Design a protein with these regions (language model features):
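N-terminal secretory targeting modules
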Residues: 1-41, 210-222
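Surface-exposed acidic, glycine-flexible loop patches that form ligand/cofactor-binding
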Residues: 3-5, 90-100, 131-137, 211-215
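Structural recognition of the beta-strand scaffold that forms the well-ordered cores
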Residues: 11-15, 20, 57-61, 102-107, ...
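Sec-exported extracytoplasmic/periplasmic mature domains
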Residues: 20, 54, 109, 131-138, ...
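Conserved SGNH/GDSL esterase-like catalytic core that processes O-acyl groups on lipids
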Residues: 25, 30-124, 148-160, 187, ...
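Extracytoplasmic/secreted envelope proteins and their assembly/folding machinery
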Residues: 46, 50, 127-130, 201, ...
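Glycoside hydrolase catalytic-domain groove-lining segments
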Residues: 117-142
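Catalytic His-Asp segment of secreted/periplasmic serine-dependent ester chemistry enzymes
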Residues: 148-222
Length: 222
């Protein structure tokens, strides 16, 4: 008999936007509007990766948000503003010592591009965010994932990751090709559907396995 206590704990954290939420992933195609009934967070690239590794996982994601700006250009509540707090409505500092991930995956950038942020400003914001995350997660691998929807900020993301990696070898980058040339991978409002999430999960699983040496194992979380 095996159970959760039979294995050393693996911990993953996903910091993201609508893709990590599962926005529109159950939709029949990009022509469909968003509906809560077609958003399934249990079938995202993040959830698939978590189950593959049998990991204890935390998700911090909110649709439309970015590093500097949201998808409509507002800079009122970017991810770095609330990530370090208990909640949006109770902005007390979060106690990060209570739970430390082995790998933290950051999947952000698409909404900044749509919100009119320049590449230079995004790079500076991403560098600052990575350094702040390192301050609260001193031993975690930090993996920036980008490209599944929009590829325009690849130069900015690369520059940010390379800047921090020069001082921190546990920082890395995973670029995933966009769904935009592939209508068969698009759900509501041109978001990734189940096929796209599965493709992204395969790429992420391969990357994390290479980084950590983790193999697949039974998952005890839904």
């Amino acid at each position: 008999m095996t159970g959760p206590d039979s294995f050393p704990c693996r911990r993953l954290e996903f910091i993201g936007d609508s893709m990590t939420c599962g926005f529109g992933n159950l939709s029949a195609g990009p022509q469909e509007p968003f509906s809560p009934t077609t958003e399934d967070s249990t079938q995202t690239y993040a959830a698939l990766t978590s189950r593959h590794f049998g990991a204890d996982t935390r998700y911090l994601c909110r649709s439309g948000r970015g590093i500097i700006s949201d998808c409509e250009g507002s800079r009122a509540q970017p991810v770095p503003r609330w990530f370090f707090e208990t909640s949006l409505t109770h902005p007390q500092p979060w106690d990060f010592s209570s739970w430390q991930p082995d790998v933290a995956v950051i999947n952000l950038g698409t909404n900044d591009r749509n919100g009119g942020v320049s590449q230079e400003e995004f790079t500076a914001g991403a560098v600052a965010f990575l350094r702040r995350i390192r301050g609260v997660y001193p031993n975690a691998r930090l993996l920036w994932m980008y490209g599944l929807m929009d590829e325009d900020f690849i130069p900015a993301v690369k520059e940010a990751v390379e800047t921090v990696r020069a001082e921190d070898p546990l920082v890395d980058l995973l670029l995933v090709p966009s769904i935009y040339p592939h209508p068969e991978e698009q759900g509501a409002c041109n978001h990734p559907n189940l096929a796209a999430h599965a493709r992204a999960a395969r790429a992420l699983i391969t990357k994390i396995a290479k980084q950590t040496g983790w193999a697949a194992r039974p998952s005890f979380w839904p």
